[in-house]
């Protein structure tokens, strides 16, 4: 993924609390080692009918043509709870999501997301509720809701309304400069090499 400064996209509402990683991508798909093509398994058990796999559940929001090409997911508290599985982040990214906005996230999922440069935005419950209401109004009027997330200003903008969010400087740096832990470490490669060269012989 490229560096993230600002993104404008269609908002998709997933009005469910405590969505765990098994909901995001079920365990049977964890044997897949490639990050590509995981998007088709995103929310698999909700997205497809139980007794006829791969038959879309027309009542699930991801199958609503109205939200096709959505890139900003709006959801509720404790998103990404449950077991640690990086596949959950990979599936969200491969589907096309660039930003997830919720009132809280599970800690390990939060770290995995930023390591893969998926931006997570935390807003208050009341602010999340306001956004859901805004989406409902737009949908009722047959208008898609576009949201702009500006990481330089730490803002979420919906028309004339702005919400401000906080983010750790380290994670913000990852996103703005397209870094991960490996690329960040490689910035200090010369220092690491110098340290290794100065090690006593018995440590080499």
From Swiss-Prot:
Where would one find the signal peptide in this protein? none
Gene that this polypeptide is encoded by: leuD
- KW Lyase (keyword) present: yes
> What Pfam families has UniProt attached to this entry?
Aconitase_C
For biological process, the GO terms are: L-leucine biosynthetic process
Disulfide linkage: none
Alphabetically list the UniProt keywords.
Amino-acid biosynthesis, Branched-chain amino acid biosynthesis, Leucine biosynthesis, Lyase
One GO CC term on file: 3-isopropylmalate dehydratase complex
Q: This protein is called what?
A: 3-isopropylmalate dehydratase small subunit
